[in-house]
UniProtKB/Swiss-Prot annotation:
Biased composition (Acidic residues): 186-195
SMART domains for the chain: HOX
Keyword Secreted: no
Organismal lineage: Eukaryota, Metazoa, Chordata, Craniata, Vertebrata
Disruption phenotype: Mice are healthy and fertile and do not display any abnormal phenotype.
Gene: Lbx2
GO biological process: muscle cell differentiation; positive regulation of convergent extension involved in gastrulation; positive regulation of non-canonical Wnt signaling pathway
Tissues in which the protein is found: Expressed in the developing urogenital system, eye and brain.
Protein name, as recorded: Transcription factor LBX2
Organism: Mus musculus
Annotated region (Disordered), positions in chain: 1-89, 164-195
Domain of life: Eukaryota
Amino acid sequence: MNSVHQRRTPFSIADILGPSMVPEAPSAPQLPEAGPDPASPLCALEELASKTFLGHSPRATPQPSEGRAAPEAPPGPGAGVRRRRKSRTAFTAQQVLELERRFVFQKYLAPSERDGLAARLGLANAQVVTWFQNRRAKLKRDVEEMRADVASLCGLSPGVLCYPALPDSTSSPDPGPSGPDSEPNLSDEEIQVDD
């Protein structure tokens, strides 16, 4: 029974560490390749698992009949040559200032605008694209955090009506003609406080 358990667990210590790290059992009887019912779900699962994990075992090599190309480097820590990532771009203060200034007015740039901005700032087009993507993600995180803060403040004071402090995307950006009556004024009737 012990050998059956070892055969069907590709996650055993011996399989993970490999033969050099774990002492071999004195003589474990080998199981036949096919069980009593080769069409059983357990046998199919075992066959799939053995094919799936065959390339991950340091002592096994993939068979050409599997339809996969053999890996050029053995898997493992530090194995294989990876492409180096580009180093992180350090933008100058002037570049960041200009990018932020443009972002305030325009969250998305047309390709021609992006090319012009990149040329003016001495950056690659991809750097400008990446900066704007990252800045939009940061804005989204900041807005969600502020909304959560407002919601938590409203939860602390249930007697006070909370009005959204952040602009809603459905509201128009232009409030209309400005004047003394155009600004929303809060009166005592609008703020209900339980005494």
